[in-house]
């Protein structure tokens, strides 16, 4: 017989949503500001209501049953609609609200101060957690550990990082596109030579280890030309490559997005930017669409919709 929602404590659905996000009784309890024992009792009531275990223990935490997986989207939408009713300007800001972002650095650092101010103006008691974008970030968005990702994708047809290769569960919006530049110190000897492909390849390069790979579209384009660069150093972040390229008597070249000019202005690094020595068709393959990414279940989540629009407005000048 069909059960009536009037006999269900709706707080249990919030508990169920948090268990789905956290995959942990302890973590869900912390977010609800209750004891793990209280969450366990709520889970027992939910299991009785749905006549299903809902979650089973696994080495990685709670693993949802097929029934729980089938309810995930509907539950998320129900919670989002509930939040829409509660997210009114004159209502008290919810305690414990978190904004969890995964972003390419220094992309986020350029606007982090402005973004944090806007978040705290609207949600004074919120907390912000920022992690570097890495090979696991898309999975973190899918698992509900990250609200929004902000990162560059690639345009080369053979790249694994194409927008068209994103998982079906991920929605996205391109905020701006960028073509990388070559960054070198202001007194680098290459500045006294003709700037062409031979000069570019004559000097040692700094590579960025991107999603567990030391090569990217630039290396694909060079391979098509039968050429190869000498990678003398591999670093995890663009700002580290810029710092190293700026060191006195350093012959290293860094290839990094054009937007890094804003980062350089903030930190006053003695660097010059030169265009990559390729023709227009090759440059097109090196375009990097900088993209906001989120899970489809959060497409109408008011917190995340607001965060997306706020980030979009902050980076509008770079479009």
From Swiss-Prot:
Pfam families: HTH_1, LysR_substrate. The keyword Transcription applies. GO terms for molecular function: DNA binding; DNA-binding transcription factor activity. It comes from the Bacteria. Residues 25-44 bind DNA. Gene3D superfamilies: Periplasmic binding protein-like II, Winged helix-like DNA-binding domain superfamily/Winged helix DNA-binding domain. Residues 8-65 form the HTH lysR-type domain. InterPro entries: LysR-type_TF (IPR050389), LysR_subst-bd (IPR005119), Tscrpt_reg_HTH_LysR (IPR000847), Tscrpt_reg_YidZ (IPR023746), WH-like_DNA-bd_sf (IPR036388), WH_DNA-bd_sf (IPR036390), YidZ_PBP2 (IPR037402). Keywords: DNA-binding, Transcription, Transcription regulation. Belongs to the LysR transcriptional regulatory family. Involved in anaerobic NO protection. NCBIfam families: PRK10216.1. This is HTH-type transcriptional regulator YidZ. It comes from Escherichia coli O6:H1 (strain CFT073 / ATCC 700928 / UPEC). The gene is yidZ.
């Amino acid at each position: 017989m069909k059960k009536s929602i009037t006999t269900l404590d709706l707080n249990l659905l919030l508990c169920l949503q948090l268990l789905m996000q956290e995959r942990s009784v302890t973590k869900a309890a912390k977010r609800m500001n209750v004891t793990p024992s209280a969450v366990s009792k709520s889970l027992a009531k939910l299991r009785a209501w749905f006549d299903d275990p809902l979650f089973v223990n696994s080495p990685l935490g709670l693993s949802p049953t097929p029934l729980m997986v089938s309810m995930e989207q509907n539950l998320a939408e129900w919670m989002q609609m509930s939040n829409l009713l509660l997210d009114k300007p004159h209502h008290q800001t919810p305690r414990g609200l978190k904004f969890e972002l995964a972003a390419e650095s220094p992309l986020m650092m350029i606007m982090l101060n402005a973004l944090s101010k806007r978040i705290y103006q609207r949600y004074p008691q919120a907390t912000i957690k920022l992690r570097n974008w890495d090979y696991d970030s898309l999975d973190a968005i899918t698992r509900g550990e990250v609200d929004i990702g902000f990162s560059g994708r690639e345009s080369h047809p053979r790249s694994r990082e194409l927008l068209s290769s994103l998982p079906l569960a991920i929605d996205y919006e391109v905020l701006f596109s960028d073509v990388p530049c070559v960054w070198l110190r202001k007194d680098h000897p290459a500045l006294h030579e003709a700037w062409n492909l031979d000069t570019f390849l004559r000097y040692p390069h700094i590579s960025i280890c991107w999603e567990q790979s030391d090569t990217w579209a630039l290396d694909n384009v060079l391979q098509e030309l039968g050429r190869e660069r000498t990678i003398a150093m591999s670093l995890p972040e663009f700002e580290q490559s810029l710092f190293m390229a700026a060191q006195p008597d350093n012959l290293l070249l860094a290839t990094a997005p054009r937007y890094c000019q804003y980062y350089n202005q903030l930190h006053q690094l003695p660097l010059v930017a030169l265009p990559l020595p390729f023709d227009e068709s090759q440059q097109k393959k090196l375009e990097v669409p900088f993209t906001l990414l989120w899970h489809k279940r959060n497409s109408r989540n008011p917190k995340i919709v607001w965060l997306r629009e706020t980030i979009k407005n902050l980076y509008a000048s770079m479009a």
